[in-house]
C-alpha cells in the first residue's frame, strides 16, 4: 500500500561462541568498514542531544510497519520466541503487536543503551494496560556491538528473528547471518530490512561533484551500502533455505540538503566510516547544496528528493518439511513431450522422446548430414526466409541458418561477390593496357 506522509521539511512518497565460528565457506575475510563505537555514540546522541527524538522516527516507523506486514503475511508463521536484532527503541515490536501476532517471548538486542531504554519513562501507563491485556513485555539485551555474542539465548531456541534497518552498519554480515541461524529452531524464519546501495544516491553525487570542484579531491561522506546480490549470496552460503530478497524505494522530499543532513544525524544514520574525513569546508557544503537542487530539485515546490532503497530478505532454517528440488535425472518424461515438438519445429516419435536429429552420443548433427550417412539424397530446403533481403556490411559477413540448421550464403551476396571479382579483373586489364 502506498502511503504519503506530510510534515514540515519533508514529504514521504510511496511508502563463548564467536560469530566468526559460524563461517560456512572458504576464502572469507572479514572487512572492517564502520567504526562501531562511533555508531553507538551517534545513536546515543539521538536521545541525549535531541529535544524530541520521536519526531525523527518517521522513516524507521514506516519501514517497520511494512516489515510487520511481510512477517504476518507468511502462512502459518510462528511468533512464539522472537528476537529483534538491532531493535533501536522497539518500533517493530509495537507494530507486530498491533497487527495481532501471538508472542510468547520477545527479545530486543541493541548496542545503544540510550536508544534501547528511550521510551521506558513514557510508557508506564501503557505497560499497565499491556498487563491487563496479557501482552508480552520485551526482554532487553544490551551488547557492545551487534557483532558480539548474544548472552542469554540458547541455540535453536527462536521461532523468528527480525531486524529493521540495522544490519547495514554491521562489518561482518556473513558471520552475523551465520550466528543468527544457529539461534533459529528448525523451520525458523529470519526476516529483515536494510538500506541498499542506491540509498542517498543524490546526496552522494552532489557531495562528490562539489568536493572535486572546490577541493580537487574526494572522500566518502555517505557510508557504503550493501548490494542486493550480495545479500542473496550471504543467505545461500550460510545455508538458509528458500532465500528470498526483494527491494523497494522510498522517496522523501526535503526543503534543502541541510534539512536532510540534520534529519539523518538525529536518526543516528550519519556517516560512521572508519577512515572518514573529519572536516569539510562550509564552501563545499554550500556548493553541494546548489548542485543537489540543480540536478535533482523538484520544480513544483522547490524541494529536493532523497531516495532510500530498502532491501527485504527472508531465509529459513533447514527442516525436512520444506520444499526441496528433485534430484538431477529423476524426471520421468522428456521436457519436449510437454509440447510434442522440438525447438526446431519437429515432432517426436511416439515411441521415443529423443529427436531424430540427435545421435546416440548426443552429438548434434543436421538433418541433411544424417540423410547422407544413410545414403539418402538430401532434400532441398523450402525455407523462404533464405531469399529475404539481408543487411549489407563491410566489416563482417552474414550467414543464415535455415530451420534444418544448415548454413546458407545469400544469393544476393554471392552475386555481389561475383560482380566485385569481375570488376577487379576488368580494372586490372585496363591498367595493363595503360601501362603498355
Curated annotation (Swiss-Prot):
Residues 391-411, 421-436 have a biased composition (Basic and acidic residues). Involved in the assembly of mitochondrial NADH:ubiquinone oxidoreductase complex (complex I, MT-ND1) at early stages. Probably acts as an arginine hydroxylase. May also have methyltransferase activity. Its EC number is 1.-.-.-, 2.1.1.-. It holds the Pfam family Methyltransf_23. Keywords: Methyltransferase, Mitochondrion, Oxidoreductase, Transferase, Transit peptide. This is Arginine-hydroxylase NDUFAF5, mitochondrial. GO terms for molecular function: methyltransferase activity; oxidoreductase activity.
